[in-house]
């Protein structure tokens, strides 16, 4: 029995060794469907991802000559073959010089083309006429569902072209931009996003752009499984305007808004957008819309407070901005206001924003 047992044990060891050798030999040709998809996404999309380094010009105590001092790094991606690069506004904010490094190591000076601080987006341009650029493939973020796989590619902590994989954890989140204006319809993901990933692409299983990684929620400053990305449909709408005009062409109502409005809403116990005054010659002025006025004794008299635009309730300036961003100059909207316990309606044609 001992002999037989040893014989069986030896046979098993021999079989395991052979199986291990076969497995090792075949591993390079084997991958699960998900692994194959990840590899394909990385190979196809990573050439579109760039490293962004920003620097400020400063004078030191020992020299009057300004020097470039590195401030930080982030990620971006190639938008088109003309050299336009998309990234986060906060990546290039206050930078005097921005360098863009392609995947092959070629580095270019970049110039700003347009920025949208309220959406934390910026467009840069590099002169790379003799270089074959690989633009990102735009996707439709409205098709995302919670549980769908997403892939982030970026340069966390300066480690270039790093890929992480996760799922869509939630949709329709709101986060603050650098201007404190709310960014709506934000994608939440558990794909690891760390400092340096900002401005990089969030991709779906087809390798299409579905978001721009912009923020993490983390007390430690590192990835904690809660990352946020600006939806691709917002990016697809804003970037062409930044390229053509240098800023978002959000139409205006022809009114000025009250600064620090939240304080006054609490003070006066009201909801809505407080009209400070109307722009001279504009349609709201002609129709009789009224802003704040001073009465006897220096008291401030409340004028029109916007509470609805078309069929959408308006509680604050974020609601107003979100409504107008989906409109175009020339469209007419119904503006519902409250004034002196009355409900008023104005039919107003939206105007193009004034030139800067």
Cite the ranges covered by each PLM segment.
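N-terminal secretory signal peptides that target proteins for export/translocation
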Residues: 1-5
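Bacterial N-terminal signal peptides
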Residues: 6-19
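Serine-dependent protease modules
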Residues: 22-270, 277-280, 298, 317-321, ...
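Conserved PDZ fold ligand-binding element
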Residues: 85-86, 284-317
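Short coil/loop linkers at secondary-structure junctions
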Residues: 270-271, 290
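Charged active-site motifs of nucleotide-sugar-dependent glycosyltransferases
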Residues: 271-274, 305
């Amino acid at each position: 029995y001992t002999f037989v047992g040893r014989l069986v044990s030896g046979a098993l060891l021999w079989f395991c060794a052979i199986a291990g050798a076969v497995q090792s030999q075949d591993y390079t040709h084997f991958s699960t469907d998900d692994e194959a998809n990840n590899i394909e996404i990385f190979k196809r999309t990573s050439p579109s991802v760039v490293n962004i380094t920003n620097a400020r010009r400063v004078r030191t105590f020992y020299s009057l000559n300004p020097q470039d001092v590195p401030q930080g790094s982030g990620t971006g991606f190639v938008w088109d073959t003309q050299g336009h690069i998309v990234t986060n506004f906060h990546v290039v904010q206050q930078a005097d010089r921005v360098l863009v490094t392609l995947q092959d190591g070629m580095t270019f000076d970049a110039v700003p083309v347009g920025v949208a601080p309220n959406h934390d987006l910026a467009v840069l341009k590099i002169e790379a006429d003799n270089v074959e650029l690989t633009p990102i493939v735009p996707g439709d973020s409205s098709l995302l569902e919670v549980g769908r796989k997403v892939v982030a590619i970026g340069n966390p902590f300066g480690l270039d072209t790093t890929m992480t994989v996760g799922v869509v954890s939630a949709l329709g989140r709101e986060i603050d931009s650098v201007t404190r204006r709310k960014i709506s319809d934000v994608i939440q993901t558990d794909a690891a996003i760390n400092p340096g990933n900002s401005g990089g692409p969030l991709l779906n299983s087809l390798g299409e752009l579905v978001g721009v990684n912009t923020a993490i929620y983390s007390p430690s400053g590192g990835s904690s499984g809660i990352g946020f990305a600006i939806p691709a449909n917002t990016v697809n709408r804003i970037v062409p305007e930044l390229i053509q005009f240098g800023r978002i062409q959000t139409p205006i109502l022809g009114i000025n808004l009250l600064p620090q409005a939240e304080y006054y809403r609490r003070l006066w116990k009201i909801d809505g957008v407080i009209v400070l005054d109307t722009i001279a010659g504009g349609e709201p002025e002609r129709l009789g819309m009224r802003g704040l006025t001073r009465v006897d004794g220096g008291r401030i008299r409340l004028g029109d407070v916007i509470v609805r635009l078309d069929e959408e309730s308006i509680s604050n300036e974020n609601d107003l901005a979100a409504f107008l961003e989906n409109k175009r100059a020339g469209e007419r909207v119904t503006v519902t206001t409250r004034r002196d316990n009355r409900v008023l309606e104005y039919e107003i044609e939206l105007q193009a924003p004034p030139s800067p």
